[in-house]
């Protein structure tokens, strides 16, 4: 294979030609342009190189010809015309003269310039050497290099004393889907599920690959259940030597190896299925002339193993690397010393730079497009509210609550959920009442979820409870189902510097059972990127007096500390706290049987503050009640004459008493009273002290000494050893469930009631549950399906289930944790939302070729501009045309993270609220021949009204006038400073009695 063909082959790998079967994400776009990319690689690239050479060759020849003409005339003038032959050559007798030598050198350069085409092959080899250094086992891995010899690396360094750097530095980790979620597809009457199960390792088995692959489960690969539901089970693991031979995967990329394994798995599954009808459906030809099952197998394995990272500035990185490569490899010292004619290597360097920059433009266009999709503020897909009955009464009155109850008794979904969560069966209004007395009716604190009711019900509920209350003030918390980077990015404007305490327990970077997808070579690097990306955003929402806690174990503490030093500042490190882990799972015999190291009984909790001089936090430890008060000497060694006086017949000549005379005599009297009362009550001094309010001092004479009583201490200041409390618990059937006692200590010590607490790796929901019980506001973010609900032997569980039980104060699990300790009785109000994900954004790309742009940019259109122009009308970027009805804006969304995405109406108003950073006060909905939604909020001390309604381009002047008058009437009582309105409008700053600035929503949205 020649150098050009070798470079072509590399480019096909870089542009994912092997992914031509894939129809999701960026692959769909590359496949859309597959023919044009192929034409560029197969034809245009060589033409570009030849054109570049031709240009530089002509420039070089003209320069050399000019130099040759100058030296020829100089020879003729100095040595005479006889020095040159009629053909223009130098006669032999003049060759050793200084001028003759110069003539011969320039003539040789002139002759050599005619043969410059021979270095074209060398240029392709240079380009191959440059780009191949970033292509590794099927992945594009941009890492700083300073030589191809010995595969040497370099890192950016600015003279820091210590520098933490990792392979995926300056990149986003983007694998936002669940780790190996069920993959489901349908074919007529059958439903197939690909499910990943834990691999069972044989003792002493020898791994032949470091890479992991999807292989069929050894024990139960295929199961056909009811209704023709097929479950196909896979393991994700390394291969042993026998498997490498069986699958015939000794060489090739990881992608090609997985495809070979998929082919074998396809054959095996068909062998296992005896039902001919099902087999026929799975074998029918599908996309790209592949059988349906094989196509889905390739799609499943690709979705779970591709697209880990996006570089934050690929063009800058590769351009800098290309410049260095040219200087160090193309124009190296060895080349400059060895070559007689440097002109051709300068031409070679220019062509390498020119063509290299073309390839970089193409690669960075794709990378920057993905970066733009990743960084785009995501849409809120759905918004619901959960509010307990008592809060409806508090905020909207008992009459409205009775109206709500009439709807509740008809909402079968709500009634069923209450029964399943252990709240009891509700059939009539009396079942909702806790007690009646002369003061009125006290209702049970049952949580009402608006998802079980109509949109009209939700709108009326929000309007009624915000008539006399500000919504964000009375909301206790916010749950967001989303990958956490996207959630943090979305809410950043609203919650900037508002969070008092952040606690996270991110997935640990363990070995085979890591909680995230990673390239085997870059497990720790992947974990570092996950944390770095998210911690940088978290710093933006942390208040200036706030604290952040990150829990990890020995697998990651060596990464967490320097990473947090870099992001939050070394001066803001407060402490490293040790937290108890769960009990060892193995028995004592097994621990000693294969003992390789001593057991690890604690995790690390890293505590940082936003600013060193503004942190609040005092950690208190409760002392055991078994510790009693005691008597001790009242005399002190210090010598203050004013504290020497007679007590019960004893005086001092030196030294001093502890207290002044007034306090001491009162303490003597207090003890005398106790001695008088105790024979009647039978109380100990400890009990008497408790009953009288724990404020009394006691002093007595004991033989020839004076003593005072030291009451038992209930609390003491903590150090960084927190092994006195559990670190994990198992109350909600969640593997890594943090204990409520641990979170109570963290939250109570670093925040006050009403402060905001956040956990963006929410897990089982402990942080939000504890925050609610302690009277804090809270935000929780989690992307897993357990956000909603999952079934256990103890009844339904999940974050949403847990928070509903917390609001109720009881259920299948509650009261639990700290509920009894803080006397938690329930009640509350929170919002939960589902947010668009990066994968959803990719699904909503619509390409529309731009003829004008192609004409304008010519050959550069494909390399630099096609993605920008051809996707600008996609729904993910906000299509203004679709926004004419803001209540019907649709995106393709996969809410259940399985199967194909479905068109879903998204919550445009809530999305815009986040973009503005609006603190919501009031919400009301009106009908004036169309739906009008009015939102009143506040930002930077100004009241802002946001108005949404459908509109048409065909509105007449009368329509616009009526629209204006209606809006003015509805906004009169709010008197906002700024009004945002969507679509057409004739609103003016003279807004009734209260002038206001009028702004349009669409330009703000497009930012």
Question: Language-model features: where?
Answer:
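Short glycine/proline-rich turn/loop motifs
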Residues: 464-476, 514-519, 722-732
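Conserved beta-strand signature within the Rossmann-like core of class I S-adenosyl-L-methionine
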Residues: 546-550
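Short acidic, Gly/Ser-rich segments with clustered Asp/Glu that frequently serve as metal-coordination loops
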Residues: 484-487, 509
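Conserved proline-anchored active-site loop of SAM-dependent methyltransferases
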Residues: 234, 497-513, 564, 757-771, ...
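Mobile active-site "lid"/loop adjacent to the S-adenosyl-L-methionine
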Residues: 500, 507-530, 534, 543-545, ...
């Amino acid at each position: 294979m020649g150098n050009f063909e070798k470079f072509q082959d590399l480019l096909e790998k870089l542009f994912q030609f092997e992914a031509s079967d894939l129809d999701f994400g960026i692959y769909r776009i590359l496949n859309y342009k597959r023919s044009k990319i192929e034409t560029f690689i197969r034809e245009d690239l060589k033409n570009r190189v030849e054109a570049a050479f031709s240009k530089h060759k002509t420039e070089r020849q003209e320069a050399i010809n000019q130099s040759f003409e100058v030296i020829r005339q100089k020879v003729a003038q100095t040595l005479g015309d006889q020095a040159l032959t009629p053909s223009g050559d130098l006669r032999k007798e003049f060759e050793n003269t200084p001028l003759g030598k110069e003539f011969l050198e320039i003539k040789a350069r002139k002759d050599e310039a005619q043969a410059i085409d021979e270095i074209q092959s060398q240029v392709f080899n240079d380009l191959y050497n440059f780009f191949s250094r970033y292509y590794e086992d099927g992945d594009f891995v941009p890492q700083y290099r300073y030589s191809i010899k010995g595969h040497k690396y370099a890192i950016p360094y600015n003279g820091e004393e210590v520098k933490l750097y990792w392979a995926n530095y300056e990149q986003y980790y983007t694998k936002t889907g669940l780790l190996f979620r069920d993959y489901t597809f349908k074919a007529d009457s059958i439903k197939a599920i690909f499910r990943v199960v834990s691999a069972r390792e044989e003792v002493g088995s020898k791994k032949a690959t470091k890479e992991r692959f999807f292989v069929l489960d050894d024990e139960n690969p295929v199961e056909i259940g009811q209704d023709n539901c097929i479950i196909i089970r896979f393991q994700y693991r390394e291969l042993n030597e026998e498997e490498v031979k069986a699958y015939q995967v000794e060489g090739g990329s990881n992608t090609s190896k997985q495809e070979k394994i998929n082919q074998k798995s396809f054959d095996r599954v068909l062998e296992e299925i005896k039902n001919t009808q099902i087999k026929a459906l799975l074998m029918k030809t599908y996309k790209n002339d592949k059988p349906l099952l094989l196509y889905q197998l390739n799609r499943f394995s690709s979705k779970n193993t591709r697209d880990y990272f996006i570089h934050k500035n690929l063009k800058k990185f590769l351009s800098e690397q290309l410049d260095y490569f040219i200087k160090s490899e193309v124009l190296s010292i060895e080349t400059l010393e060895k070559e007689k004619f440097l002109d051709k290597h300068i031409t070679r360097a220019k062509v390498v730079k020119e063509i290299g920059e073309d390839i970089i433009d193409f690669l960075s266009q794709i990378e920057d497009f993905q970066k733009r999709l990743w960084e785009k503020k995501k849409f809120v897909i759905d918004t619901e509210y959960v509010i307990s009955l008592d809060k409806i009464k508090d905020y909207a009155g008992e009459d409205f609550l009775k109206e709500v109850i009439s709807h509740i008794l008809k909402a079968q979904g709500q009634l069923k959920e209450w029964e399943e969560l252990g709240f009891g069966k509700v059939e009539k209004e009396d079942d909702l009442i806790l007690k009646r007395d002369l003061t009125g009716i006290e209702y049970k604190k049952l949580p009402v979820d608006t998802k079980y009711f109509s949109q009209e019900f939700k709108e009326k509920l929000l309007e009624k409870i915000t008539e006399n209350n500000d919504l964000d003030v009375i909301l206790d918390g916010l749950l967001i189902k989303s990958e956490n980077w996207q959630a943090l990015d979305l809410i950043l404007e609203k919650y900037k510097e508002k969070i008092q305490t952040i606690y996270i327990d991110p997935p640990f970077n363990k070995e085979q059972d890591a909680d995230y997808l990673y390239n085997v070579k870059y497990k720790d690097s992947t974990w570092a990127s996950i944390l770095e990306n998210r911690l940088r955003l978290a710093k933006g929402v942390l208040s200036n007096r706030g604290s952040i806690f990150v829990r990890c174990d020995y697998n990651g503490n060596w990464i967490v500390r320097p990473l947090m030093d870099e992001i939050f500042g070394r001066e803001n490190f407060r402490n490293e706290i040790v937290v108890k882990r769960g009990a060892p799972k193995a028995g004592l015999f097994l621990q000693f049987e294969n003992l390789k190291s001593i057991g690890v009984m604690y995790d690390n909790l890293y505590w940082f503050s936003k600013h060193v001089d503004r942190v609040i936090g005092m950690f208190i430890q409760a002392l055991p009640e078994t510790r009693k008060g005691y008597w001790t000497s009242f005399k002190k060694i210090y010598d203050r004459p004013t504290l020497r006086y007679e007590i019960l017949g004893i005086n001092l000549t030196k030294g001093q008493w502890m207290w002044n005379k007034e306090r001491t005599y009162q303490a003597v009297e207090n003890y005398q009273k106790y001695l008088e009362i105790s024979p009647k009550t039978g109380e100990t001094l400890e009990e008497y002290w408790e009953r009288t309010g724990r404020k009394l001092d006691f002093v007595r004479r004991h033989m020839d000494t004076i003593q005072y009583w030291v009451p038992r201490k209930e609390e003491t200041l903590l150090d960084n050893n927190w092994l006195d409390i559990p670190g994990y618990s198992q109350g909600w059937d969640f593997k890594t469930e943090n204990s409520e006692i641990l979170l109570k200590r963290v939250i109570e010590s670093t925040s006050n009631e009403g402060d905001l607490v956040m956990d963006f790796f929410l897990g089982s929901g402990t942080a939000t549950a504890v925050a609610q019980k302690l009277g804090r506001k809270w935000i929780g973010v989690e992307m897993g399906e357990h956000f909603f609900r999952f079934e256990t032997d103890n009844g339904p569980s999940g974050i949403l289930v847990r928070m509903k039980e917390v609001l109720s104060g009881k259920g299948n699990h509650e009261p639990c944790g700290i509920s009894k300790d803080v006397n938690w009785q329930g009640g509350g109000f929170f919002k939960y939302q589902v947010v668009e994900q990066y994968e959803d954004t990719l699904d909503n790309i619509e390409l529309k070729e731009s003829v004008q742009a192609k004409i304008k940019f010519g050959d550069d259109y494909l390399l630099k501009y096609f993605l920008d122009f051809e996707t600008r009308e996609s729904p993910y970027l906000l299509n203004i045309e679709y926004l004419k009805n803001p209540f019907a804006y649709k995106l393709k969304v996969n809410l259940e993270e399985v199967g194909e995405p479905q068109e879903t109406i998204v919550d445009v108003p809530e999305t815009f609220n986040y973009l503005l950073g609006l603190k919501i006060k009031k919400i009301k909905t009106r009908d004036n021949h169309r739906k009008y939604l009015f939102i009143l909020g506040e930002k930077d001390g100004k009241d802002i009204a946001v108005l949404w309604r459908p509109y048409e381009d065909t509105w007449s002047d009368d329509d616009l006038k009526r629209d204006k008058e209606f809006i003015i009437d509805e906004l009169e009582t709010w008197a906002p400073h700024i009004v945002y309105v969507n679509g057409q409008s004739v609103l003016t700053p003279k807004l009734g009695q209260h002038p206001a600035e009028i702004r349009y929503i669409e330009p703000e949205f497009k930012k």
